Amino acid sequence: MNLEKVKSIQLLKLVLTGFYLVFVAFWIQSCTINPATGKKSISLNTMAEEEKIGRSEHPKILRAFGGEYQNLRLKNYIRTIGNKLANVSELPSINWKFTILNSKEVNAFAVPGGYIYVTRGLIALANNEAELAAVLAHEIGHITALHPSSRRATGTLTGIGVLASGIIFGRAGSEIGDLIGRYSMSRYSKSQEFEADLLGVRYLSRANYEPK
């Protein structure tokens, strides 16, 4: 390897390291106190941008789960419960959307922008309205705690880290960074699930459901 090429690689490493450090500083500055949790939360997007992300993901989710379950009475029922809970959350003014997915799978989840999904398979297992409300309240808790947003922010930061580690430390560094990135974005942490539980109980109580 000639001297000029070595210098070019060293310069590239310095540039990427500097970019990575600037991004980390920006990431830290993006931390704000979340009114729902009272803790610092990370979000690189405004609420309008969050809603745009959710709107973009919505058709993909519908395709992946067999579309929206077309039972108008049940749709209105779930929407009524969801809005009742969302209205007593720390984010009552965002445009919450509650969708029943036409899937036998037992699942419920949330994406940025106030998009909450519950499958007909899960609804079929619920014994009463309070149990459905508990599921929806938990997912609302993920949104108000900004868990989907912080996961995306962490994923963005990790992606930069994978790029930097690959160039600075070679293939091994890239593989390690990629492994960390996949793990960090694969699921909510136990602490996030517990936090969503606590917030869910708060919203159930405010909406006059008896948490169980």
Language model segments and positions:
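A Zn2+-metalloprotease active-site environment signal
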Residues: N2-Y20, F26-K212
